[in-house]
A protein has these predicted regions:
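Short extracytoplasmic
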Residues: 4-36
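Extracytoplasmic/periplasmic terminal helices and flexible tails
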Residues: 9-13, 28, 37-40, 46-47, ...
Length: 111
């Protein structure tokens, strides 16, 4: 399974993939998709997990404030499931902490 993100900053191969806080796989590769020029994240999901719906969403999350980046999956309501090689299109990119701090400082400075 793969997912396309606007920004995959800080995510690397072997990062964990979770569902409801439980690790169900790992990131196998992070690259640029040649068609969309978005960050493409390939994931290996445990074979026991065969219930990811077509409308599953993926978010790049951070463990703690400055911790490791990982993928969090959320299952949708669709009854059909993702096949091997499917691409998750409903994604939330990494929150870049430097951008967030910069925005807070700008706002505090009377911006």
């Amino acid at each position: 399974v793969s997912a396309l993100f606007d920004n995959a900053a800080g995510l690397s191969p072997r990062a964990r993939v979770t569902l409801s806080g439980v690790t169900i796989g790992e990131v196998t590769a992070v690259s640029i998709d040649q068609q969309t020029l978005m960050a493409k994240v390939d994931m290996a999901i445990d074979s026991q997990v065969d219930y990811l719906s077509l409308d599953t969403s993926a978010s790049i999350l951070t463990a703690g404030l400055l911790g490791e980046k990982y993928i969090g999956l959320s299952i949708g309501a669709d009854e059909e499931t993702l096949n091997d090689g499917a691409i998750i299109e409903d994604t939330q990119s990494a929150l870049v902490i430097e951008e967030l701090v910069g925005q807070v400082l700008l706002n505090l400075g009377g911006g």
